[in-house]
């Protein structure tokens, strides 16, 4: 920060020492932030990568750190309060996540018509975070909107993009952090070159053309991390089972919340205990505890540039119809067949959420003028990757695997050789 009035520091395995101001320390010690210690970052991935037990708390600290670096290194006239606001927003950007992170998103959308971003704003406005923010001279509503990329600031609209854009502090942190904790190694990208070459172009964050190879590496790393971590077929099996358990628990009257206090009581620990006691879903939790996971018996991957196909695959009615047709051919109850696609709310960090080709690029003339450049004109790699990668999978219990696979091939077509690839 321009005026370094740090309270102290925390040792982080990704960035070394992360400094905190007194304001950030006070916010960190509130219940909404401390609750993030009990919410895993990529719930379900630990069934594939045993060390993937890191939480939303350390991710939030990392986003705070990178948001501050990005803000203070932009060659524009940002005040200390602007930089501190970005850091606070980064620290608080995930407080609205439910138990098991993105796995809970379906419950929020289906039953509460909310997303975790909506709840992030709510908690920043209505919880004790609000009292701390206001006492420190900041406006909770402004911080809440900045944390989810909805701040309307005519003079500095690019502040939103520090937290939420195609190349933001959130994605930079989770790419490095999730790769580190899983051991998948795809996140070895020089994000600091991106940070130090960013500028503001027409009120948007933009990357200097000199950093194009790093930007390409970032986009490729995101694709590979998605395939090998966020949509790994075994990790998704665990997440699908968790999502089904949560659905059954909600139908049984569990997972209710009306107040901030109610919601803050929901974390991985308390909800897991509730699921174990719920007669409707106890058998699912028992299977998870024994790692008796659903089996993927069919998979087809494809790239499309038409988002209509992505929307079709996400449609619950479409997926239910496919599951029923497969179940009928298998002589099974439709409950035994699950269709999974990466654009579902429970899947973290789907590539279609932010498009790499939307990233502004610029080059500089000798007299310092910034010239806009189009990324897809300059990078064949990003041009190729601009199609949305979709994967449709069919899961069932191991004892039904063969007949469901046969039925799925009849309904959806034979599986390509690419399904033999391990991801």
Regions found by a protein language model. Name each.
Residues 1-85, 95-423:
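Histidine-centered, transition-metal-coordinating active-site segments
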Residues 90-91:
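Elongated alpha-helical scaffolds
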């Amino acid at each position: 920060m321009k005026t370094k009035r740090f309270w102290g520091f925390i040792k982080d395995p990704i960035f070394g020492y992360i400094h905190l101001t007194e304001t950030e320390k006070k916010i960190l010690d509130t219940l909404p932030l401390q609750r993030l210690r009990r919410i895993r970052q990529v719930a379900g991935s630990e069934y594939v990568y045993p060390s993937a037990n890191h939480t939303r708390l350390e991710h939030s600290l990392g986003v705070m750190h990178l948001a501050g670096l990005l803000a203070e290194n932009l060659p524009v006239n940002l005040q200390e309060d602007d930089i501190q606001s970005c850091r606070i927003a980064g620290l608080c950007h995930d407080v609205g996540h439910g138990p098991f992170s993105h796995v809970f998103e379906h419950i929020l959308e289906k039953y509460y018509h909310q997303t975790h971003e909506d709840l992030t704003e709510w908690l920043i406005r209505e919880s004790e975070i609000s009292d701390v923010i206001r006492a420190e001279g900041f406006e909770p509503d402004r911080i809440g909107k900045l944390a989810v990329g909805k701040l309307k600031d005519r003079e500095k609209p690019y502040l939103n993009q520090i937290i939420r854009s195609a190349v933001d502090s959130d994605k930079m942190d989770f790419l490095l952090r999730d790769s580190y904790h899983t051991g998948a190694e795809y996140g070895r990208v020089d994000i600091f070159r991106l940070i130090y070459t960013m500028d503001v172009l027409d009120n948007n964050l933009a990357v200097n053309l000199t950093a194009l190879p790093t930007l390409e590496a970032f986009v490729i790393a995101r694709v590979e991390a998605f395939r090998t971590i966020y949509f790994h077929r075994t990790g998704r099996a665990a997440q699908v089972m968790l999502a089904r358990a949560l659905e059954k628990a909600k139908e049984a009257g569990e997972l209710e919340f009306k107040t901030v206090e109610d919601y803050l009581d929901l974390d991985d620990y308390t909800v897991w205990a509730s699921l174990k006691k719920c007669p409707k879903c106890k058998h699912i939790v028992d299977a998870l505890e024994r790692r008796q996971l659903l089996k993927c018996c069919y998979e087809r991957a494809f790239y499309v540039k038409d988002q209509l196909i992505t929307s079709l695959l996400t449609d619950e009615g479409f997926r239910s119809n496919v599951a029923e047709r497969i179940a009928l051919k298998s002589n099974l109850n439709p409950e035994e067949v699950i269709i999974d696609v990466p654009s579902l709310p429970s899947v973290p960090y789907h590539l279609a959420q932010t498009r790499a080709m939307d990233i502004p690029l610029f080059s500089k003339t000798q007299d310092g003028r910034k010239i806009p450049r189009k990324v897809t004109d300059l990078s064949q790699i990003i041009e190729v990757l601009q199609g949305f990668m979709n994967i449709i999978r069919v899961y069932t219990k191991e004892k039904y695997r063969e007949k469901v696979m046969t039925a799925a091939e009849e309904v959806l077509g034979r599986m390509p050789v690419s399904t033999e690839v391990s991801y």
